[in-house]
Amino acid sequence: MNKITKYIDALPLSDAEKSALPDTSLQAVHQALDDDHQTFAREDDSPLGSVKARLAHSWPDSLSGDQLVKDDEGRTQLHAMPKAKRSSMIPDPWRTNPVGRFWDRLRGRDVTPRYLSRLTQEERESEQKWRTVGTIRRYILLLLTLSQTVVATWYMKTILPYQGWALINPADMVGQNLWISFMQLLPYVLQSGILILFAVLFCWVSAGFWTALMGFLQLLIGRDKYSISASTVGDEPLNPAHRTALIMPICNEDVDRVFAGLRATWESVKATGNAAHFDVYILSDSYNPDICVAEQKAWMELIAEVQGEGQIFYRRRRRRVKRKSGNIDDFCRRWGSQYSYMVVLDADSVMTGECLSSLVRLMEANPNAGIIQSSPRASGMDTLYARCQQFATRVYGPLFTAGLHFWQLGESHYWGHNAIIRVKPFIEHCALAPLPGEGNFAGSILSHDFVEAALMRRAGWGVWIAYDLPGSYEELPPNLLDELKRDRRWCQGNLMNFRLFLVRGMHPVHRAVFLTGVMSYLSAPLWFMFLALSTALQVVHALTEPQYFLQPRQLFPVWPQWRPELAIALFASTMVLLFLPKLLSIILVWCKGPKEYGGFFRVTLSLLLEVLFSVLLAPVRMLFHTVFVVSAFLGWEVVWNSPQRDDDSTPWGEAFMRHGSQLLLGLVWAVGMAWLDLRFLFWLAPIVVSLILSPFVSAISSRATVGLRTKRWKLFLIPEEYSPPQVLKDTDAYLTMNRQRSLDDGFMHAVFNPSFNALATAMATARHRQGHILEIARERHVEQALNETPDKLNRDRRLVLLSDPVTMSRLHYRVWAAPEKYSSWVNAYQQLALNPLALKTK
């Protein structure tokens, strides 16, 4: 069999069609497949003429009549997106300087948006009612939190050993030995720092406690007159004039999982009978060429399997401007005006058709709602770490989400996915300008979701959490280290967002959201400083003689005092604030039926194990978050390159590499405290033991085998595992099917395989006009690539080749026409582990 017959045999044709092709040359084969009988000046451009035929034979059920068109140079192009109808989406520059804002106000340039003019009188009254209620509730929350913090801080002050602040007079220290003055002041300086940090941290814990408590009461009562879900009956027909786009921004994601979840979601939408009201947009920012080809293949298969022609679209951006938020902005500018609403999905999102339809109904029933956020439930993971986190979010999460809604009402959070957005005000008000200045906290906004919610509210639109709406799902990171990688990005984003705290027009609730976002990570170094100062105070007490006389002619000494009964009482009170939300959560589960969680005994045991697990992980997260915050402020880049692994487990070597410093710190801390005062080590035991065990906990909890064993024992069981909804069962089934036909080494297949080459050529985005300079550049790219071995061709160069239909055509032609000349490429392709199911296109 010669190279021509080998090529013909690789074509997606029937035996009769193959036998009818000429076997004289590759050019003749492509000319025979070209129904338009195009002529090309170069022989190696002839595959451009056969692209349409190769695509039509490979994916006949995926193409509609008007998708394959000719570009300006007569090359076949696959239109994977509808015709654009552009809108203007221009960001307003940020004024983060309060002095500048004050000057604008003096000159009459500080104009507050007059949003109420678009509402009817009845809508204004309803709007004003819930906003007044929300304001009153938040003042109550502030009063409760501050009162609790003041009392606890006063108790903390009485517990601390050195009580002689009032006797210290700086004037008496003039002329005194500096060392003596320093030793007199040191304990009190340490105590002052401890007291300030305690007040801040206790206030943070108190706010979480009251949020969970109100969420518990809300869920226990079961009635919420201000719940946005109560604004519809739930079976109203959707308005055909208001169409919705389901948009999924992705970037180098697990292609099999992305398209499995998307297919399950779309089929659930079709089952409701409302598919005509929705379109799907897969918005790819992927820059891994292998993944890009796999995405194109998966999109073609998805369209064929769900009959999604004209409703499921795919786009890969050539210029990745502003990451995810820029991807969404690009969609809004090009196609947003064609839709009333859009639902943003993450790569791991799965939503039922009924949930999506309900979100649309809520938008139509609440004309002043700008964003409605569903409450995603975590499911689908098997590692011990992920199952424990799934259980925690499933049991505790509803309390905190309902509590957030209770305090915030329509001035709430948006988490960036599984939410519906009103497109027109989003385009008008939510474009994100880069933060001004230079440095680590300038440039493109990373955590865009909080900022978009704040801008939507600033324009007068409501931002709601539909906390009681079922059918919204997501997945969690499989292990601790993957979660910390995500936290590294979120930490940087939240610290950047705090620069917007004083921006004009931001609602106080969203200023508080920026503050809580910062505190989510800043609390870690504050806690670490609190522990460090407490340790330092103990060192001072153990190694130095107390200063009993702080004033000249002082008659009575100031004795250090210890009040263990108050210390125990304060410790117990703090533990109540920390752990009572967990107890309330389990009480709610007991009241509503623990069967779906494994029964009364197992859900209680799971709770106790989760508490132990969270105690072990809290100090570990504290140290990592402290490093993240410090590195962000100092402008350090935390490089985190994990080794490739076949599953989600953390290798022992990586665990000790990441946690080795924590283990060492825990050992030194424990030994030092045991030497100084064994009693103080008792109080530090939860911290130091967690640090010493951190590599072991991190590695063992990442094992799916351990997680599946707990699943068999019905520990950490959640309702989605006890009785999986159909959309999750479909996701698992489609994921299994996609894994079986998964395409690896997509770029090499796009070079060699006739079907995938046709697909890559038709979907290539660099549609340049012919030009002499461009022709020289193309020839240089192709020649340099073929004269090297494929493994020396880096990712960026592969992406350049993949983006140009002409270079892909020439690569394809040359490796087939002269296999002996380009033997390094041919041998590399033949050595690949080929998946026959992945290459089966018909």
Swiss-Prot record:
SUPFAM superfamilies membership: Nucleotide-diphospho-sugar transferases
GO molecular function, one term: hexosyltransferase activity
Top-level taxon of the source organism: Bacteria
Subcellular location: Cell inner membrane
Pfam families: Glycos_transf_2
EC number(s) stated in the UniProt entry for this protein: 2.4.1.-
CC annotations in GO: plasma membrane
Transmembrane segments: 140-160, 194-214, 513-533, 568-588, 615-635, 656-676, 680-700
Keywords: Cell inner membrane, Cell membrane, Glycosyltransferase, Membrane, Transferase, Transmembrane, Transmembrane helix
Gene3D superfamilies given in the database record: Spore Coat Polysaccharide Biosynthesis Protein SpsA, Chain A (3.90.550.10)
GO BP terms, alphabetized: glucan biosynthetic process
Similarity-based family: Belongs to the glycosyltransferase 2 family. OpgH subfamily.
Name assigned to this protein: Glucans biosynthesis glucosyltransferase H
